């Protein structure tokens, strides 16, 4: 009835100064709280449980969504359940109590149920949404909710691991006892580890039955749990200890050199690619590295990597410095300088071929590429020198050291057209003068003939 009255007239339920004394919500910063807070705590899910329909999940309750808790739910305490009866029963229980391999007075289902209650009971009891005494109601609601179903999933995972552990123990028979320990069994040690300390975690060898190799340690450590699943590791360690120190072939437990992968070969090929005039040459080392690999490593050994030597051919670039002041004319013509450069480059290439050892196809390809790059650079230098020579022939750009190539071409075209026009003009004048000369010669001849 109070709820209906509040919904019909919300203003009457919210005076100016409202103060609720709720022990769960300490909101000092908010003097006016929403009207849907209740002074008394009521078990909403307990009322819904009595109905015939399935109660909604915790995340579907619209009223519980607006509850502003001071802090989120705390993480489950691992020390709170150490003294519970189920924990003591599991810790003191030894699966190998009987000779027939049974679980003593407890069946397999009872063992899994005790471990499930041990791992998931405290976490569920600490949640703020359910009654800790109502276990059936928790199972009906919490498992269906995506927010709280992690508890049941964790309990199911632990149950599956314990079942697989017991099955492996029964299949393998009696495990090999570890060195230095008498009659300790793997199962009893595993259950004793649960009651050792809350900060300790489950041994990884229980979850991962196969031993994990660590490259940093010289040899793996033998644990009581790992011997139950890897009986061959104990024999390998014992054989390694029994072998003398001076044996020529020691037992190699780990592979120091990783095998060559496809990515490594691709990187080597990319390094061998040559850009512009930089050539790459492979030199075989005088002595090959001998890598001794163990038979257990699978025969993977990295091939000897020949060092890559970068050689830069001496090419006369004659790059023009545009920022330099105007210099004097070159001593040698461009044609003579080109002959000297080409002769020097070809002589250097021939010397490299004579001094080198017999080459493979890759080395010959590198030589061809290097020769092509040298000739291409020489062609570019000749083209640059021709531009400079053309610039020196143009009167307007004769003293301009920073003239670009486009301006040189435009000015050269205009200058050529003007020179051609001047040539035509001079040719026509020459013809006129030649005719005038012919006329004067004829007149002079006539005057000589007329005089006695």
From Swiss-Prot:
Glycosylation, residue list: 71
Biased composition (Low complexity) is annotated at: 223-250
Q: Which residues carry this modification: N6-acetyllysine?
A: 156, 161, 170, 288, 330, 336, 384
Q: Write out the residue ranges of the motif 9aaTAD.
A: 113-121
What the entry lists under InterPro entries is as follows: bHLH_dom (IPR011598), HLH_DNA-bd_sf (IPR036638), Myc-LZ (IPR003327), Myc_transcription_factors (IPR050433), Tscrpt_reg_Myc (IPR002418), Tscrpt_reg_Myc_N (IPR012682)
Biased-composition ranges for Polar residues?
A: 348-360
Residues bearing PTM Phosphoserine? 19, 75, 84, 94, 164, 172, 174, 306, 327, 342, 357, 360-361
- What sections of the protein cross the membrane? none
Q: Where is the composition biased (Acidic residues)?
A: 264-276
Q: What is this protein called?
A: Myc proto-oncogene protein
Described by its record, this protein's role is as follows:
Transcription factor that binds DNA in a non-specific manner, yet also specifically recognizes the core sequence 5'-CAC[GA]TG-3'. Activates the transcription of growth-related genes. Binds to the VEGFA promoter, promoting VEGFA production and subsequent sprouting angiogenesis. Regulator of somatic reprogramming, controls self-renewal of embryonic stem cells. Functions with TAF6L to activate target gene expression through RNA polymerase II pause release.
What industrial or biotechnological use does the UniProt record describe for it? Answer: POU5F1/OCT4, SOX2, MYC/c-Myc and KLF4 are the four Yamanaka factors. When combined, these factors are sufficient to reprogram differentiated cells to an embryonic-like state designated iPS (induced pluripotent stem) cells. iPS cells exhibit the morphology and growth properties of ES cells and express ES cell marker genes.
């Amino acid at each position: 009835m109070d709820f209906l009255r509040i919904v019909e007239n919300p203003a009457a339920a919210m005076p100016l100064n409202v103060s609720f004394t709720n022990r769960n919500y300490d909101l000092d910063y908010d003097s006016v709280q929403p009207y849907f807070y209740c002074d008394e705590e009521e078990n909403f899910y307990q009322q819904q449980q009595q109905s015939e329909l399935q109660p909604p999940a915790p995340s579907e309750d619209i009223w519980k969504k607006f509850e502003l808790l001071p802090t989120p739910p705390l993480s489950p305490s691992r020390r709170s359940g150490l003294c519970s009866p189920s924990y003591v029963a599991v810790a003191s229980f030894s699966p190998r109590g009987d000779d027939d391999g049974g679980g003593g007075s407890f069946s397999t289902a009872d063992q899994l149920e005790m471990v499930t209650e041990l791992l998931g009971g405290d976490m569920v009891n600490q949640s703020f949404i359910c009654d800790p005494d109502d276990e059936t109601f928790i199972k009906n609601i919490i498992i269906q909710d995506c927010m709280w179903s992690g508890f049941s999933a964790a309990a199911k995972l632990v149950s599956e691991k314990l079942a697989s552990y017991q099955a492996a123990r029964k299949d393998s028979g009696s495990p090999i006892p570890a060195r230095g320990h008498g009659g300790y069994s793997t199962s009893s040690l595993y259950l004793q580890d649960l009651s050792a300390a809350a900060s300790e975690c489950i041994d990884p060898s229980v979850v991962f039955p196969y031993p994990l190799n660590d490259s940093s340690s010289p040899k793996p450590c033998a644990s009581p749990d790992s011997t139950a699943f890897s009986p061959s590791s104990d024999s390998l360690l014992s054989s390694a200890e029994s072998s003398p120190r001076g044996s020529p072939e020691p037992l190699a437990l780990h592979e120091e050199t990783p095998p060559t992968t496809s990515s490594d070969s691709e990187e080597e090929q990319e390094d061998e690619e040559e850009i512009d005039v930089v050539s790459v040459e492979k030199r075989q080392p005088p002595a090959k590295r001998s890598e001794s690999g163990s038979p257990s490593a699978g025969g993977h050994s990295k091939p000897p990597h020949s060092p890559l030597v970068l050689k830069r051919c001496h090419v006369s670039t004659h790059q023009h410095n545009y920022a330099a002041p105007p210099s004097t004319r070159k001593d040698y013509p461009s044609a003579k300088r080109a002959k000297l450069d080409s002769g020097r480059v070809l002589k250097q290439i021939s010397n490299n071929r004579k001094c080198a050892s017999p080459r493979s196809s890759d080395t010959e390809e590198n030589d061809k590429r290097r020769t092509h790059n040298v000739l291409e650079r020489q062609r570019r230098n000749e083209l640059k020198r021709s531009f400079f020579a053309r610039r020196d022939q143009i009167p307007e750009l004769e003293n301009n050291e920073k003239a670009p190539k486009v301006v040189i071409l435009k000015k050269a075209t205009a200058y050529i057209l003007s020179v051609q026009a001047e040539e035509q003009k001079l040719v026509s004048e020459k013809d006129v003068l030649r005719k005038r000369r012919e006329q004067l010669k004829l007149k002079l001849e006539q005057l000589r003939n007329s005089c006695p």
